[in-house]
Amino acid sequence: MHISRLLFRTTLFLVPSTILVTAGPGGYLELANLTPYDWKLKYTHSYHMDWQFPSTIPARTTQEQYFEWWYDHGPNGDCGAEATYELVGSPAPASFTVQARQRKGRRIEIQYGDQLSSLGNPVGSLITLGYTHDGTVLFVLAGNETGSYVSSNPPVAWMQATLPTIGSKSLREIAMPAGHDAGMSQVTRAYGGIAHNTQTQSVHVYQQLIYGARWLDIRPVIRKGRWYTNHLTGSIGAFGRTIADIIKDINRFTKENPGELIVLDLTHEMDRKNWKPRLTPAQWKMLYDLLYYGLDDFWTIDQMDLPDDLSSVPIETFVQAGSKSAVLVRVPDHAPAFKTTFQNKDMTGDEKPGPNENSNTATDEPLDINSPSTFPGNSTLDGSGDDDDDDDDTPESIPDTINSNSTSTTLPSLPSPKTSKTFTPAFIPAHRLPTVGSYSNTDQPTYLENDQLTKLSLYRPSPQSPIHQSTWTITQHLAHIPDFANPSTSIIGDAVAAHRKLFSAIWKGLSSKTYPNLIEVDDIHDNQIAALLKTRSVEDTPRQQAERNGTAYAKFERTDA
C-alpha cells in the first residue's frame, strides 16, 4: 500500500513536468492597424492551439498577440487556427483572415478577403508571414480606400513602386531597412571567432536586397591583396564574404530590379598585415578600383550640379521611373578622394582584369549558423599563412562573372543639365551623407527599446533633421560568446528578441514628423522590416491629415491583451 501511494504521488508530481516539457512551440504576431477603420473579429476557430484574439483592434493601434501550437508534430501536424477581421466602415467590403498552419511547416499567413488589396498584393492575396520560435511576425495595414493600402509583402523593387510618392522626397524624408555588418552572412577565415559570435546575417547581400535592405554596412579588410568583409574586435573575430561576392550579389539584384538606390556604407576598415585599423591611400585606391570597375550601376555625379549635403536632394536625383539602379559608396571622411575623372568602363577584352580563381561560390540559401566547425566558403579558416612573409599587394582582379552582365545603358539623368559636365564616381565622404544615431551596446531588450526611442525623439524633431540611423541590435552577452552549442545565444539568436522589441515598440515613437530613416538590424531574413517602413510612403493618412489641419490626433496606442 505504501509503495502504491508513493507511486501515485510520484505520478502526480511528474505529470505537470511532462506537460511543461511537451508544450508546443509558440510565438507572437504583431497586428498594426494604421487605417482609419476598426478591425472587428467576425469569426475565429482553432484546433489544438492557444489562439485568443481580441474582439476589436481599434483604428491607429497595435496588438501583440501570442499563439501556440499545443503539439509539435513536425512539418505534418494538423494543429491550426483562423481569425477573420473586417474593416468596419470601409466603403468597399474589406476583410482578412489570420491563419496558423502546421502542415508543410509551421507558419502564420494572411488571406485577403472581400475587396481588400494593397500595394503589390491584389484582391485574394495570400501573404506568408512565416514563423520564428518565441519571435515575432508582423502584419501591418496602412492607408485608406482612397489610395492603395500599404501592407506586408511589399514589392521587391519597392523604390520604383513608390517613386511617385518618394521621388520628390530626400533621404531625410524616407525610411529604409539597413543590414548591420551585411557581409557577415558566412565565415571564411576565423581568428578566434566562430559563426556563433561573429555571423550577423543568415542570408547573403542579394537576399537582403530582395527583402528590402537598401543601406548596407560593409566592413572591408585586405589580406594579401584580397578583399573580405570583417567582424573583428582588434585581431579577434572572423572574415566574412569577399567584396567580389558582394559585388556579384548587387549586380544580380540591380539587373533583376532596375531603378533602386543602394548605399554601401564602408566602415571599420582593416589591413590584416599587423592588424592595422586604417588603410593606406594605395589600398583605398585598390578598393575603389575593385568597386568602380566591378559594380554595373555605379552612380556618377556632377559636382557642379549638387549641394555638399546629398541627403537633402530628391530621390529622383539618383533614380527615375524606368532608369537603371544607382549604387553609392559612402566612405569615411579620412579616406582619400577618388580621382577627379574616371576611365570608361567599356574596356576591351585584353584590358579587362582577369578572372579571380579564388572567388567564393557560396549560395544565396540561408546558412547553418549553429555549426561551430562548418564554415561556408573555400578559404583557410584558421588564419594559417597570414603571417608568412608575403608583401604581395597586387590588386585583386575582378572575376569575369562580375562584369558579365554589364551594360552600357544611360546613367540616371541629373537635374539642371549644363553644357559642360565633369562626372566622378560616387565615392561619397561621410560628411556629404551625414547620419546621426548610435547603437545601444546592451544585451537587455528593454534597455534597447528605451534607448532607441529616446534617440529617435532627440534626433528627429522634424522631417528635415539629418538622416537618423536607428540600430535595433543586441550586443552578445559575454557568457554567451563561447556558448556555441546553444543557437538562441548566438548573434542571430539574439536578433529574435531585438526584432520583437522593434515590432512592438517602434509605433510609440512614430509620427509624421518623427520617424527613423534607417532601421539597422541583424538577421534580415524576410521583408517584414521593409513592410514596417513602407508605411512611411502612405500619403494622407488620418494622422497626417490631422496634423496638417491642426486638429488633435492621439499617439499610436498599444492594445496588448
Predicted region positions:
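Long, acidic (Asp/Glu-rich), low-complexity accessory segments flanking structured domains
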Residues: 24-211, 224-256, 261, 276, ...
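Intrinsically disordered, low-complexity acidic segments that are enriched in bulky aromatics
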Residues: 233-299, 303, 323
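Fungal secretory targeting signals
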Residues: 1-23
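Long, low-complexity intrinsically disordered regions of secretory-pathway proteins
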Residues: 359-410, 558-561
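Surface-exposed substrate-engagement region within the catalytic domains
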Residues: 300-357, 368, 411-511
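Conserved, mostly hydrophobic/aromatic
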Residues: 219, 264, 519
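Active-site-proximal loop/turn and secondary-structure-junction residues that shape catalytic pockets
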Residues: 222, 268-270, 333
